[in-house]
């Protein structure tokens, strides 16, 4: 077993620094042709609230430079459609915590796109004694994690769509179906191709590793150290046929020790330290069911600036995202 680094032979490297190399230019040319020929889709994972941003609203409604995260991603999709006359289906995965507000937002904001919504399941939150935490007339719940996409997406029509680019809502620099990525995915006939950036020390991202096959270890579960280790930015392309195959496969559950609000006799309690466990499934645990999957390094400064924290943190906050947008997003989205 070994973590994937910049020196790994099985890492796809279409960039030298921030510029495309010969392989990258080849992939881009292939991808541009395929964007004109194929019906592709994008899934935006939007089940989370902006709790760490001091808001109970869906994270996708948070604004960077006067535009919501949703708006930044919709603009990217519209640019692709305009530039390549691309046929792109748009899907948004919500949760019971975000569904109503997200749908209401898109009803009041016309992006000129046909968007389908589907909702992931919840899981019970349990206390340290293993019993479900009380929540008024029921039990406390939380979204079941991005791994529930394989079950939840069966709610929508995927007919004719060959591949789906799955991204997290919080990365304001996410390149959706960019030609380099699409070209690399089709060139080597992957079931899944994932993007990576070189991981920074103590950065809270999962790490890619090779253990008979490619895997990701979530940041809370890995001990990745060393130079050039590749971090997960939650930007994957899947064959639609693979996603359909995963429908009846149960992914492993991961427990996270969290501060979970609960009630006692109808009175709301907001704990100041972790008091229970949330159960999640992770999308990357599907990797073990692939025939072929791969990872492609991309430049962090152009493709990864997640909004994860409020201003009480010095990283991944509204200011760092604003700076990233000003430097790299406003200039051009598609290259």
UniProtKB/Swiss-Prot annotation:
Keywords on record: Cytoplasm, Nucleotidyltransferase, Transferase
Binding site for substrate: 146, 308
Protein name listed in UniProt: Probable UDP-N-acetylglucosamine pyrophosphorylase
Binding site for UTP: 45-48, 59, 120, 145, 170, 278
An individual GO BP term: UDP-N-acetylglucosamine biosynthetic process
E.C. no: 2.7.7.23
Signal sequence range: none
A Pfam short name: UDPGP
Entry annotated with the keyword DNA-binding: no
Motif (Substrate binding): 45-48, 218-219
Localization per record: Cytoplasm
GO MF term set: UDP-N-acetylglucosamine diphosphorylase activity
Species, as recorded: Encephalitozoon cuniculi (strain GB-M1)
Superkingdom to which the source organism belongs: Eukaryota
Enzyme class: transferase
